[in-house]
Amino acid sequence: MSHYLLAIDQGTTSSRAIVFSAQGLPVASCQQEFKQYFPKDGWVEHDGEEIWLTTLQVCRDALARKGLRAADIAAIGITNQRETTLVWDAASGDLIHPAIVWQDRRTADYCAELKAAGHEANVSARTGLLIDPYFSATKLRWILDNVPGARQRAERGELRFGTVDCFLLWRLTGGRSHRTDATNASRTLLFNIHSQDWDEELLALFEIPRSLLPEVLDCAAEFGVSEPSLLGAAIPVLGMAGDQQAALIGQACFQPGMVKSTYGTGCFMIQNTGEQPVTSKNRLLTTVGYRLDGKVSYAVEGSIFVAGAAVQWLRDGIKLIDHAHESEALAIQAGDSNGVYLVPAFTGLGAPYWDPKARGAIFGLTRDTGIKEIVTAGLQSVCYQTRDLLEAMRQDGTPPSALRVDGGMVVNNWMMQFLTDILGVTVERPEVTETTALGVAYMAGLKAGFYRDLDDIASHWHLQRRFAAHMAEERRGELYAGWQNAVRRVRSEA
């Protein structure tokens, strides 16, 4: 009997595979980093073949590490960096252009034109999103208009579009399945979150032929079956969700009002709002939290473009540290950033500012400033940006009393304590922090019969540590005011 679930977690800087038991515990994993390419200012690309090859390799290696065969795996779940856009030949499966990553800002001018023409209100009403280079539609249009012959080939039905989940599914199934799920579709700027279908008016606005687009399924569904030659036997793909929605599921945030925040390359805070979509007055996004049996649970989301990427920049860009884990020890030594603020607007600012032309800066440098203070400011910048999102949720009338956290950065205890101090709310870290992969494993397991329902899944969530705020309210206000001043100074309209 097949006792395990294989979760593919394809991220912005690495591909991972984690094997989970039926109890939701990781039993084997493998991870491979791959390269990001920055061909021009504000452009971010991936080699789609590297995405596929690293994904396939980590799946094979994860099974090998536990001594498992494909027959031991009941189902595969796929979770992924969202919005990243790929286009490939329908016959050969060959990509026609590098993947354009969610961080890429090349379409900022086109987005500004659409806003100036008055399209944003209609687009937002249909999709829950804002017109921004972050989302897939303008990236896809750019590929069609800038790769020779691409638009003509698309109109002839010769090309396929997909976000990373869809592309991996196509490759895993040998080109037999061109499908995505409702969470990934909801991030394209082409999907109507009310009708739960591709929106013809939006396809016309962005000039996207419908033949490019995949079929949209629930998060727990029969997506396809893997090619036997890839992993040693055919395995059904039964779960799919974008990375942040997968983390919402993995954190068992199934009740309206529950909030999770994931700290990876970026930071993403999502709050479950239940069966009705809630429109934010503070430029948060309305999105699909998950869809099961055709029934949607909606969410509001705040997206921060640079979180862990700030630490990567400190390591790789200006080489202040050799390893990311050094940041915690340096912050403990420093105790405080001593008035230094790092605003990591390397590719603009996300929610609630949505300023693609903002650029990063460091403020408050003195003769006494050293590596410790700058690294500490980098960690604090992630917490301040989380406070920006929390304030937006509060102003929308949905203040969370606790925040469930996950992702690679949450092992940093110093940062978690500063986070709870600057937010003024309890921060809860679960036993299993790889909740993105866990969430999609849950979806695959739900379809495979491992779990009865969402209550059954929620019973597997366990708290590892709760962080409580100790900072005085006056000090919290002073620090956050300094951050707000720093952000004002990097805004494009400043």
Curated annotation (Swiss-Prot):
UniProt keywords, alphabetically: ATP-binding, Glycerol metabolism, Kinase, Nucleotide-binding, Transferase
Assigned GO CC terms: cytosol
Positions bound to ATP: T12, T13, S14, T265, G308, Q312, G408
Reactions the enzyme catalyzes: glycerol + ATP = sn-glycerol 3-phosphate + ADP + H(+)
Residues reported to bind sn-glycerol 3-phosphate: T12, R82, E83, Y134, D243
GO MF: ATP binding; glycerol kinase activity
Binding site residues for glycerol: R82, E83, Y134, D243, Q244
GO BP term, example: glycerol-3-phosphate metabolic process
Annotated pathway: Polyol metabolism; glycerol degradation via glycerol kinase pathway; sn-glycerol 3-phosphate from glycerol: step 1/1
Binding site for ADP: T12, R16, T265, G308, G408, N412
Activity regulation (UniProt): Inhibited by fructose 1,6-bisphosphate (FBP).
Keyword match Hydrolase: no
E.C. number(s) listed in UniProt: 2.7.1.30
Stated family: Belongs to the FGGY kinase family.
Main function: Key enzyme in the regulation of glycerol uptake and metabolism. Catalyzes the phosphorylation of glycerol to yield sn-glycerol 3-phosphate.
Protein name: Glycerol kinase 1
Species whose genome carries this gene: Pseudomonas aeruginosa (strain ATCC 15692 / DSM 22644 / CIP 104116 / JCM 14847 / LMG 12228 / 1C / PRS 101 / PAO1)
